[in-house]
């Protein structure tokens, strides 16, 4: 399969994109880890997108050890489930920022809950094509994907202009890629969105390093499922 995708007269070189923006490859790594943990919707997306362990857990410059993959996978599942539970219990429209390729849109749609996935244009191009295909036809209208610049308030405001009522914004795996100035701008933008629409913001990133250390110190405990069970030969 070509490493270049043409979409609406735009050409995206995904190999180059990983070099200049590591967030892109991290999104696919997250999806693969969720699939390895036994998430069937994530596994379906992984197969549809043709992702592999080697391609998603490593890059041209780094290679993760089995222990690092295991620790990251455990931490990811804890965070993913916690954020989903908080968002669902809020009763507000979920705004996943960044949404990546996770199957949360599928899970919320199946429950009849509205979902807005916001991310970089290149991620949205793929997510908006692959994810709705796994959502029952009568529930597709609950899911919307929007390309945004999280450091630009106008971009966020426009992406959410058709949301009626309060929002629950969830953020996982984003701030570590921002400078202090960019992180401050994001916080200001989220504050303005919440002042306008009401709701809440759940941010997992501030405890990410501590969670990883705790998981790695626990060491050697099995996760739910494994790569062979999720992706049998053939």
Which residues are covered by each model-predicted region?
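Short SAM/SAH-binding signature in class I
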Residues: 160-176
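Rossmann-like AdoMet
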Residues: 1-95, 99-146, 154, 163
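Short alpha-helix
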Residues: 226-234
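A short, conserved alpha-helix within the catalytic core of class I
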Residues: 145, 155-156, 177-194
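Conserved beta-strand signature within the Rossmann-like core of class I S-adenosyl-L-methionine
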Residues: 168, 187, 192-210
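Short, surface-exposed basic-aromatic patches at helix termini and helix-loop junctions that form
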Residues: 108-110, 160-162, 188-195
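Hydrophobic anchor residue in the Rossmann-like NAD(P) cofactor-binding loop of oxidoreductases
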Residues: 150
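Short, well-ordered secondary-structure micro-motifs
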Residues: 156-158, 213-215
